[in-house]
């Protein structure tokens, strides 16, 4: 009976680890697409006027931030479920995984709730506003927050299968 319970628990942990890997991988992949790759396409490859490209990017960010919220939150929940079902990783691995998941969630929320609306507010003011030092400072802050989240997602992705 005890062996059956251990086997069932191990199967659940294996499934949770796979789900966790899928969630963190999707989060990382989504962030790579909209972070480093999308601006290169929108501003350089398509040859769009900067204000038009910025507006398109704003719409894309608005559409993708919801799924990123869900993925980042789900990563934290699945991490907790893994521990609840008896996984006992080394304390340092568990700590770094939790911190990384929290940083990703915080970065996505800050980016989506503060930076995306703030950047879009500048877009309504026209091309001159987008050339202002205040906009450049805001945009640089958004890039740093997003890059921090992307780095944390990469760390989490590496550590998901570790115990």
What residues fall within each predicted segment?
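Interfacial loop at the N-terminal end of multi-pass membrane proteins
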Residues: 3-74, 79-86, 124-136
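Hydrophobic alpha-helical membrane-insertion segments
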Residues: 22-29, 99-112
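Alpha-helical membrane-spanning segments of integral membrane proteins, especially the hydrophobic core
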Residues: 59-60, 93, 97-106, 140-141
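Membrane-interface loop-to-helix entry segments
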Residues: 64, 140-147
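Hydrophobic cores of alpha-helical transmembrane segments in multi-pass inner/ER membrane proteins
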Residues: 68-76, 147-156
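Cytoplasmic juxtamembrane regions at transmembrane-helix boundaries
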Residues: 81-99
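Functional transmembrane-helix hotspots
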Residues: 112-127
